[in-house]
Design a protein with these regions (language model features):
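N-terminal beta1-alpha1-beta2 submodule of the flavodoxin-like/Rossmannoid cofactor-binding fold
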Residues: 1-74, 78-79, 103-104, 189, ...
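FMN-binding flavodoxin-like domain, especially the glycine-rich phosphate-binding loop
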Residues: 55-198
Length: 198
């Protein structure tokens, strides 16, 4: 039986819940990203990393990228958890920001500075598959910078006339104002099937 490691980085529990469900379905081992950086992942056949989406970035992606260099010969899958994942443009921007753009910037820098090809780990990282799962938002639990960011989101979307808001923007605004829990185990099916090779 193949060994699967599931690694997560989140703030409020949704990402961890998805990671636990993926572990259940794959008989995998669960690790927080903090734990994962301390262990030898080479003993695993497949590695799944999931992070919460925060201002377009996937939490922990930079740390995971360092881990990836050691496990790039394994089967690696990623997932991101957020409120606005129904918006195709938001998903595309998330992929570009966290995978493709990083790979592109590194490639340009390496080529310009050293006049050589980009390292294989960078190329592969830029092409990792990523699944998107809907998260939860509880205004009462949000503090600090997160509260400020969500206040800005509320102002930006709420400042538009209702007729000009997209459906996903309206749903996001309602979630920010009232809270929402979209966490649903059914989201993991395609990722689990990929890990199992189905």
């Amino acid at each position: 039986m193949e060994k699967v490691a599931v690694i997560y980085e989140g703030k409020y529990g949704s990402t961890e819940q998805y990671a636990k469900w993926i572990c259940e379905e794959t008989s995998g081992d669960l690790f927080s990203l903090e734990e994962a950086v301390k262990i030898d992942l080479a003993v695993y056949d497949a590695v799944v990393f999931g992070g919460a989406i925060h201002a377009g970035g996937i939490l922990g992606i930079d740390k995971f990228k360092k881990i990836f260099k050691k496990i790039m010969d394994k089967r690696v899958y990623t997932f991101a958890v957020g409120l606005n994942i129904d918006d195709e443009e938001a998903r595309k921007e998330c992929i570009e920001l966290n995978f493709e753009k990083q790979e592109y910037v590194v490639r340009k820098a390496v080529t310009w500075v050293f006049g050589r090809r980009i390292p294989e780990a960078e190329v592969r990282f830029g092409k990792l598959p990523c699944w998107f799962f809907k998260g939860a938002y509880d205004p009462a639990r949000i503090t600090g910078a997160d509260k400020t960011v969500m206040g800005v989101v509320k102002k930006m979307i709420g400042g538009k006339p209702r007729s000009e808001r997209t459906e996903s923007e309206q749903q996001l605004l309602e979630a920010v104002e009232n809270g929402a829990d979209y966490v649903d185990k059914s989201y993991i099916k395609d990722l689990v099937d990929a890990v199992k090779g189905i």
